[in-house]
Regions:
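HotDog/MaoC-like acyl-thioester-processing domains
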Residues: 2-19, 75, 79-81, 92-146
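Catalytic strand-loop segment that frames the active site of acyl-thioester-processing enzymes
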Residues: 2-49, 53
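Residue-level signal for pocket-adjacent positions within structured domains
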Residues: 23-25, 29, 61-62, 127, ...
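A broad, structural micro-motif
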Residues: 34, 66-68, 112
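Short, flexible helix/strand-to-coil boundary loops that buttress conserved ligand/catalytic motifs
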Residues: 54-55, 144
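Short, basic/aromatic beta-hairpin or loop at an interaction surface
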Residues: 58-66
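Helix-adjacent hinge/juxtasegments
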Residues: 65, 69-91
Length: 146
């Protein structure tokens, strides 16, 4: 199923975490739309700010390290410059050593891109993944996608 086929993903109200990111002139393609690289940068900004927010609001989780294992993107329409982008995020699923973030990019209340990103919890020492500690699992659960 495509991300856009889930009606929860098309409304910004179902995402528990939000931030507004301004667009830049350098984000524009020849057709005066936000280019695909800029769209991925906006998703990245959402992921980074969300994980930073988790560390600030849930000090018991410490400083977990995550790696992007997979990203899927649905482009629904063009993003516009100079309009700000409303980046919305929720936790779509929690596994034993990873979690899936559900992200949406909105302008003027309308979704123009959706993404799912699987984040793997990295082991503190050496290569490989590590189980999600209970404090981190609980913090992630607070941001479950409605």
């Amino acid at each position: 199923m495509a991300l856009k086929d889930d009606p929860r993903r098309l409304s910004h109200f179902g995402y528990p975490f939000a931030l507004v990111v301004p667009t830049r002139f350098g984000d524009v393609d020849l057709h005066r739309h936000l280019n695909n690289v800029a769209v991925q940068r906006l998703f990245e900004e959402g992921r980074v700010r969300f994980h930073r927010h988790l560390r600030q609001t849930h000090p018991a989780i410490g400083w977990p390290h995550f790696l992007v294992a997979h990203q899927a993107t649905d482009f629904l329409s063009e993003g516009q410059y100079p309009d700000d982008v409303d980046v919305r995020l929720g936790v779509g699923a929690i596994g034993s050593s990873s979690h899936r973030l559900a992200l949406g990019l909105f302008q003027n209340g309308r979704a123009f891109a959706l993404a799912d990103t699987v984040m793997v919890h990295r082991a503190a020492e050496g290569p490989g993944s590590a189980p999600l500690p209970q404090a981190l699992r609980s913090a992630l659960q607070e941001y479950a996608l409605d």
